[in-house]
Amino acid sequence: MGEAINLLINSKILAPLIMGFLFSIVLGPIFIPILHKLKFGQNIRKEGPKSHQKKSGTPTMGGLIFFIATATAILIMGQKPMSREMILLYSFLAFGFIGFLDDILKIIHKDNLGLRAAQKMILLVLFSVALAWYGYTNVGTDILIPFINQNFRLNLGILYIPFIVVYYAAVTNAVNLTDGIDGLATSVTVIVLTFFAIIGFRTQNVEVAVFAIALAGALLGFLKFNAFPAKIFMGDTGSLALGGVIGTIALMLKMELFVIIVGGIYLIETLSVIIQVTSFKLTGKRVFRMSPIHHHFEQVGWSEVKIVTIFSSITAILCIIGFVAL
């Protein structure tokens, strides 16, 4: 019996991981030349790091690669329309759709102004409310508190819905801000997903774990093309999709607050922008040479590879802390 269970778990881990990885590896060489031909290139902000100007024109919307890779892997595994994996896929698609619209408008206008803030927020709130309602009616309104006995959970009641709406806005924007240098958001997110996959298997949330591991595999495959020097960027299509699906994975595991710990890099990136903007408005001075903070480290001479390596290592440490916090 024990061997049978181990075999089942191993197949649930290896099959989606390998499929996600291989599908991304196959799709990359197909999508990159197509996006080049369509001139779906990234417009680089003039106020950004000067070293990034040479990246102008690099194909964007690479999130399509790991979305298709993950979706294909999950569908091959054979899922029912309202299974947790399909709900995760729906949330992946919903937030990715917002990013897709944003990317398309940037390409059309040939600048970094895509959807207006109000337009993006309306769509974010719309999809967040739908997922909050799903959580409220199907998952429960109680959430785990880090470093507190798992038997104790904070029950938010009806306040759960507005909490989740704000939570989605925070997570999606945080991941979006992290996607500023080659391979950073991809690498950090692979580690975060691995954490949630392990938790999913440990808590018998196998559907959630399978999705997380399939997406982690797809991102590892995508990293072949997204690592420095990047041949393609994930774009808002990818970063908003990742933020949304990480939010939903944590929601299903009742670990919304754990995103603050294991996704500490996302939090630091966001706080650096808030601190920079607030300081400049109040004092006329900047705390960092540039924000988000990964650009600050670029300005002081760190290479993109060094930043990704250190930030990924920090994420791995934060995930260990996340396990301790259970």
Swiss-Prot record:
UniProt GO MF annotations: metal ion binding; phospho-N-acetylmuramoyl-pentapeptide-transferase activity; UDP-N-acetylmuramoyl-L-alanyl-D-glutamyl-meso-2,6-diaminopimelyl-D-alanyl-D-alanine:undecaprenyl-phosphate transferase activity
Keyword Magnesium: yes
GO process terms (BP): cell division; cell wall organization; peptidoglycan biosynthetic process; regulation of cell shape
Subcellular location: Cell membrane
Cofactor(s) the protein needs: Mg(2+)
Catalyzed reactions per annotation: UDP-N-acetyl-alpha-D-muramoyl-L-alanyl-gamma-D-glutamyl-meso-2,6-diaminopimeloyl-D-alanyl-D-alanine + di-trans,octa-cis-undecaprenyl phosphate = di-trans,octa-cis-undecaprenyl diphospho-N-acetyl-alpha-D-muramoyl-L-alanyl-D-glutamyl-meso-2,6-diaminopimeloyl-D-alanyl-D-alanine + UMP
Keyword Transport assigned: no
Entry's Gene Ontology cellular component terms: plasma membrane
UniProt cross-references to PANTHER family, sorted A to Z: PHOSPHO-N-ACETYLMURAMOYL-PENTAPEPTIDE-TRANSFERASE (PTHR22926), PHOSPHO-N-ACETYLMURAMOYL-PENTAPEPTIDE-TRANSFERASE HOMOLOG (PTHR22926:SF5)
Designated name of the protein: Phospho-N-acetylmuramoyl-pentapeptide-transferase
Lineage: Bacteria, Bacillati, Bacillota, Clostridia, Eubacteriales
Gene: mraY
